[in-house]
Amino acid sequence: MNNFPQLVIIIYYNDFNKDSPDMKNILMLGTGGTIASEMTPDGLTPELTPQQLLRYVPAISSLCRVDCKSLFSLDSTNITPAHWIAVAQALRDNYARYDGFVISHGTDTMAYTAAALSYLVQGADKPIMITGAQKPINYDSTDSKLNLTDAFVCACSGQLAGVDIVFSGRVILGTRARKTCSKSFAAFSSINYPDLAI
């Protein structure tokens, strides 16, 4: 049995005060994925911008001030190293202006993107939370709203830094995440390392 340090923390939504002058400034970067998809004649296609996603989760506006930037809108199976570099550059270009970042992303290559960004943006002392969903945000049974809310809570918590995946109530270190289930909402596992938060 591995003797890892206990890193699990519990973050409560009620810890945030929407009237606080210390409300965090968060930048949301959109890259596409199932979370942003709508049904088209060609099937599910990433169509929604970050701004449109946030309209489904109005409570996020009480957590922080949010700016949005759509970098691209892709099925994540089409993400390449060039896209990782583009995301890393967007983080660098905006790093000084924001307290944290939330990246919406498809699940198929989310773990690869998280690992790549962990090395492309080394030493980050601000939270860079990557999230997505198994079902589009406009579905009745979607996991999108919970995952987005959790990602913003983590980005605002002041207890996390660096690149992490936030998914299905778990926070997983970006270099340790792996997609292990394609159908369950609990799609990601942390390999040989404890979850950072629940």
Describe these PLM feature segments.
Residues 6-22:
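Short, Lys/Arg-enriched N-terminal segments with co-localized hydrophobic residues
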Residues 23-198:
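Active-site histidine-anchored catalytic micro-motif
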